[in-house]
């Protein structure tokens, strides 16, 4: 398999991460009476921030939607980067590194603050990105070897 294959896998897993995160909306446990009381307090306590009046619930819910949007965009960009990697894997390495760092941090934060599903999703994505980075680097080594091969005169 080549770098672009693992980038495509990372894109699909990121899309699944987006779908799971979005399906979990509104991202709260509704079974615990104490949790319900906290959620109600979040919805009822309003304050002003940067000239806008809102609640903690507005921030919580809004950030959840923003995260879903960014996961969707990341999936789309990874798919596009995979297309670029098909013909020029070397040049997409800095992009792969950026996403790799982001998903490693995502996995660490999910481990600390959330639960297993986002940890596993981020970990699988990071693994695919790491493998694609190694494979992209190998394609550069192969190109270097090919560029040093000089054709000799005919018949030699």
Regions from the language model: what does each represent?
Residues 124-136:
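Alpha-helical transmembrane segments and their membrane-interface exit regions
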Residues 13-16, 63-69, 95-98, 121-124:
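Physicochemical signature of membrane-embedded alpha-helices that form the seven-helix bundle of GPCRs
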Residues 28, 35-81, 101:
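Core segments of alpha-helical transmembrane spans in multipass integral membrane proteins
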Residues 83-84, 134-146:
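Membrane-interface capping segments at transmembrane-helix boundaries
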Residues 2-3, 75-92:
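Juxtamembrane helix-break-helix junctions at the cytosolic face
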Residues 5-31:
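N-terminal signal-anchor transmembrane alpha helix
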Residues 19-22, 72, 104, 130:
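Hydrophobic residues within the alpha-helical transmembrane core of Major Facilitator Superfamily
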Residues 87-125:
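Hydrophobic alpha-helical transmembrane segments of integral membrane proteins
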């Amino acid at each position: 398999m080549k770098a672009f294959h693992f980038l495509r896998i990372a894109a699909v897993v990121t899309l699944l991460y987006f779908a799971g995160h979005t399906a979990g909306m509104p991202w709260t446990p509704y079974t615990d009476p104490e949790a319900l009381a906290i959620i109600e307090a979040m919805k009822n306590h309003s304050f002003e921030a940067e000239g806008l009046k809102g609640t903690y619930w507005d921030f919580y819910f809004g950030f959840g939607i923003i995260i879903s949007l960014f996961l969707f965009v990341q999936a789309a960009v990874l798919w596009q980067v995979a297309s670029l990697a098909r013909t020029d894997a070397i040049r997409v390495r800095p992009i792969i590194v950026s996403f790799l760092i982001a998903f490693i941090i995502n996995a660490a934060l999910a481990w600390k603050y959330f639960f297993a599903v986002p940890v596993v999703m981020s970990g699988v994505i990071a693994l695919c990105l790491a493998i694609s980075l190694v494979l992209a680097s190998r394609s550069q080594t192969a190109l270097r070897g090919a560029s040093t091969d000089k054709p000799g005169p005919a018949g030699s």
